[in-house]
């Protein structure tokens, strides 16, 4: 990470401990010694343990760069902790200890508050102060930021370390407060990067985020419409240049994506390009040319932790694929070429963003986009109840199906049947795969994969529910047509 930061000119704020349990925090330090998490601030043994960790980190030599962390220019500052409730005496001791090991870097007080603590401004070894802002305060983010900036003015640099989970208008107002005050900068919560297996990493916010907000993705897409991602990201980009006194340049044409190996034409993924708003997928019968555009504006945010594209209409045969990234400034050069990919069957893939791929539906089906954490970040689902049904029509004959479902309450069953004429159906027994380790603190729903192979009959597939169920994805394969 430090090597990458140096290559790209990024500077890192690195917290040395977390207040929360997710990455391991003060409770874990205390637990190792049989003490309580509040002892972390005053117990000599726990403080010594933490200082041992600090010494290990700061004096470690990076095996990639050959540079000690304490000497690495990629580090902007060491933060005493993330959102910690540290007493001033603890902060004073830890900040001083950091400075005895590292005279090259700044120290930021990680005390968790929306209003600056006066004591932090008086600690000599604290160089930067910060606040975090989320819903729940009587004052607006902008009011608090202006007051904090005035309080820190002439004493220490002030950074808004996190802010989020409010409307675009309120976020824009907060950014203006950062720009117009003596504040040194601000960071939205939060931005997730691309997955090496294709698409993005996802993080929905069921707590303070109210089951509405998710981590943002650049350059944004309609998948974030519920929280106005496209408009907010445009405002962020504008202000990122404004705070540096720079004129905002046009968006660059994206670089070519990297197409990943393809074993099935229904499972095509690529590593995306920075700034790409969509992707053009192309297919050809040979390496030399004759490329056909088979999809012109694929949104890589449409799927979560699944392949980004299925070539549902590939003719039988062997095919080559490539992908181009695109945005408002133009089209990238082609990706690497992958193939030949042998196609005997093709697969209808329905992510349930809408009901457009369904021939008929019965009952009270609704599209569900909230509760994504409980659904393992699946952002588009069809929610139904006992007796509800879906009907898909495909070219004959259906070969196999896979249906990914969640049971928000009790685990139920799903019935599957096929027909040649949409009149006479016979049931196809499904196998069930369950990978579930409990609801956990987020109330995860039970995920179940229903699947059947070697069907070789029918052109209609009926799906019937026996209880409250949400379907996240449907895959139905059938023979590919001749070229």
Language-model features: where?
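Active-site mouth of glycoside hydrolases
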Residues: 1-128, 132-139, 154-156, 166-167, ...
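Conserved structural position at the C-terminal beta-strand
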Residues: 325, 463-465
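Extracellular fibronectin type III
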Residues: 326-345
